[in-house]
Amino acid sequence: MIVANGGVDKIKGIGVGAPNGNYYNGTIEFAPNLPWKGVIPLAAMFEERLGIPTALTNDANAAAIGEMTYGAARGMKDFIMITLGTGVGSGIVINGQMVYGHDGFAGELGHTIIRRENGRICGCGRHGCLETYCSATGVARTAREFLTARTEPSLLRSIPAEEITSKDVYDAAVQGDKLAQDIFDFTGTILGEALADFIAFSSPEAIILFGGLAKSGDYILKPIQKAIDDNILTIYKLSLIHIS
């Protein structure tokens, strides 16, 4: 890529978006969904190897900046970015500025606890984190639980339980599979309830959903919107959900 862009001399800087990225330090720190452990000084490693100034931030923050500059959040000053992938990432923009907080990790909404008792274990080591229910991997976990607890026929029963993915659930839902549709209802309801709390925190103009799971469309969007509407104060009713 560097060669294709004319070599190192033509590149002014490198920007990296990564899970658990610390903008202040240029480090990836204790990322639960990456094989790297501890604190990784990735920006410094890039600079040492390539001699190019490098900035690093949380991947959801990077997505928020992208949406604010080029996408669904253009013209907005207050919004929340939610990335739905292997985990649940988030970036919070208030008055046109990213919120980083004291230590660079403000807005780890995927690690808010939404099940205090008997919650699923998370890669971070705690139990009941939002991302264990509302990420792509969380959807697969819900599918396995539903298939064990329920007896009705489902297209998902033809797939070995440990191989089920969120895309398998989506494909089954599109074909009218009731159990698959219920999985999305369950997931969307939990996410919508959490988003209602996030709305009360920053009163955003919009919440933008990004990532593979967000592409499930109305299967997940409708229960999200219903749960938000059922759980927020009337003063926040104008908050909108966008899918990027």
List the model feature ranges, each with a label.
Residues 64:
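Acidic/histidine-rich catalytic cores of soluble enzymes
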Residues 28-35:
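Short glycine-enriched, charge-decorated loop/helix-capping segments at active-site entrances
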Residues 19-22, 85-87, 213:
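Short glycine-rich anion-binding loops that position phosphate/pyrophosphate groups of nucleotides
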Residues 56-60:
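Short loop/edge segments at beta-strand edges and connector loops
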Residues 74-133:
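Glycine-rich phosphate-binding loop of actin/hexokinase-like ATP-binding domains
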Residues 1-13, 23-27, 43-54, 69-76, ...:
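ATP-binding/phosphotransfer module of carbohydrate and carboxylate kinases, centering on a glycine-rich
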